[in-house]
UniProtKB/Swiss-Prot annotation:
InterPro entries: SCRL (IPR010682). GO terms for cellular component: extracellular region. Residues 1-26 form the signal peptide. Keywords: Antimicrobial, Disulfide bond, Fungicide, Plant defense, Secreted, Signal. This is Putative defensin-like protein 235. Belongs to the DEFL family. It is found in: Secreted. GO terms for biological process: defense response to fungus; killing of cells of another organism; signal transduction. It comes from Arabidopsis thaliana (Mouse-ear cress). PANTHER family: DEFENSIN-LIKE PROTEIN 229-RELATED, DEFENSIN-LIKE PROTEIN 245-RELATED. Its main location: secreted. Disulfide bonds join 46-73, 54-82, 71-84.
Length: 87
């Protein structure tokens, strides 16, 4: 009897876990899976608009074809760290 109870409880718990995983997967953005993230450090600060600063830095480094979709900028003293998404 104990093993049957244990089996039923295990099945119920597994169904809860699997349904939660399906909910999480349904909430994922399929476009986010196609984005590539690149990081680089550049000289100078982020300025007033770090997103534009990082985009300009990546274009200067690799040309117009190297333009990111969006960026985040962090000041590191005399340098700044850019984390950018590319398609």
């Amino acid at each position: 009897m104990r093993s049957a109870t244990f089996f039923l409880v295990s099945c119920v718990l597994m169904s809860f876990v699997l349904s939660h995983v399906k909910e999480v997967e349904a909430g994922l953005d399929p476009m986010a899976a196609n984005l590539r993230v690149r990081k680089d450090i550049f000289i100078g600060g982020c300025g007033r608009d770090g997103n534009k600063t990082c985009m300009k830095d990546f274009v200067k480094k690799g040309g117009v074809m190297n333009k990111p979709i969006s960026c985040e900028c962090d000041n590191l003293g005399y340098e700044h760290l850019c984390r950018c998404n590319f398609s």
